[in-house]
């Protein structure tokens, strides 16, 4: 049976993809057949092959399996906005059954599957359904990515409590340095480590350019999952 994890963040732009790539690299190094999955992505570029999202492409590159883009990212939208807004505008409903069937297909090929969300925990996929609802439906263990910056402690605790309130397992968390470490960085890390009810899997350092392409798997302790 495949190991499956869902990666969420304390907000958008906190480094979910950077952390996801690091986790995929670590799992590959541990000998797993890995697959990254970004079921819904907004903010994509037009290419000769169609719309392509940079986060989904990074997951595709960092998977040990050779996966088609549509397998990694079944729902792709051009505008970088909440999925429920752009899907309604385009008349393309996001179906949880499609998201789930995509996950099942990857589980048949890989023994370690990482699913990356969009935005934060409660990102809406429609007027009545959120990413959190789908993760709860799938009963996926959750890995929380915390962008270490001012305000992150409150955001981390709110998200962790919401995950646990849904009855899900908070399997671990990853710290992502979204800026060069400030003078309170060590104190933020100490507080987060004490207050988040899950193990710290690793800390991705500040990287100014293309962090999702860097060899960051070495910063992850996969044995804690």
Curated annotation (Swiss-Prot):
Q: Name one GO cellular component term.
A: cytosol
Pfam family membership, one: AAA_26
Q: What is its EC number?
A: 6.3.3.3
Using the UniProt record, give the first listed, main subcellular location.
cytoplasm
Might you name a Gene Ontology BP term for this protein? biotin biosynthetic process
UniProt KW keywords = ATP-binding, Biotin biosynthesis, Cytoplasm, Ligase, Magnesium, Metal-binding, Nucleotide-binding
| Pathway info | Cofactor biosynthesis; biotin biosynthesis; biotin from 7,8-diaminononanoate: step 1/2
InterPro entries, sorted = DTB_synth_BioD, P-loop_NTPase
Its UniProt entry gives the catalysed reaction(s) as: (7R,8S)-7,8-diammoniononanoate + CO2 + ATP = (4R,5S)-dethiobiotin + ADP + phosphate + 3 H(+)
Query: Per the similarity annotation, which family is this?
Result: Belongs to the dethiobiotin synthetase family.
Protein's name in the database? ATP-dependent dethiobiotin synthetase BioD 1
Which organism's genome codes for this protein? Escherichia coli O157:H7
């Amino acid at each position: 049976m495949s190991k499956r994890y869902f990666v969420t963040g304390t907000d958008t732009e906190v480094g979910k993809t950077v952390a996801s790539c690091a986790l995929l690299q670590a799992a590959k190094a541990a000998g797993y057949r890995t697959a990254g999955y970004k079921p819904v992505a907004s903010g994509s570029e037009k290419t000769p092959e169609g719309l392509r999202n940079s986060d989904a492409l990074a997951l595709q590159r960092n998977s040990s399996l050779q996966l088609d883009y549509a397998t990694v990212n079944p729902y792709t939208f051009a505008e970088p906005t909440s999925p429920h807004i752009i899907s309604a505008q385009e008349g393309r409903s996001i179906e949880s059954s499609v998201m789930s069937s995509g996950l099942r297909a990857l589980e048949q090929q890989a023994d370690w599957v990482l699913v990356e969300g969009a935005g934060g925990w409660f990102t809406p996929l429609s007027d009545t359904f959120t990413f959190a609802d789908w993760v709860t439906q799938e009963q996926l263990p959750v890995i929380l990515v915390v962008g270490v910056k001012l305000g992150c402690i409150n955001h981390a605790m709110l998200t962790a409590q919401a995950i646990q309130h849904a009855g899900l397992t908070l399997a671990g968390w990853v710290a992502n340095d979204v800026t060069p470490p400030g003078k309170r960085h060590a104190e933020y890390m100490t507080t987060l480590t004490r207050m988040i009810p899950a193990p710290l899997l690793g800390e991705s350092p500040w990287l100014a350019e293309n962090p999702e392409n860097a060899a960051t798997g070495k910063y992850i302790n996969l044995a804690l999952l």
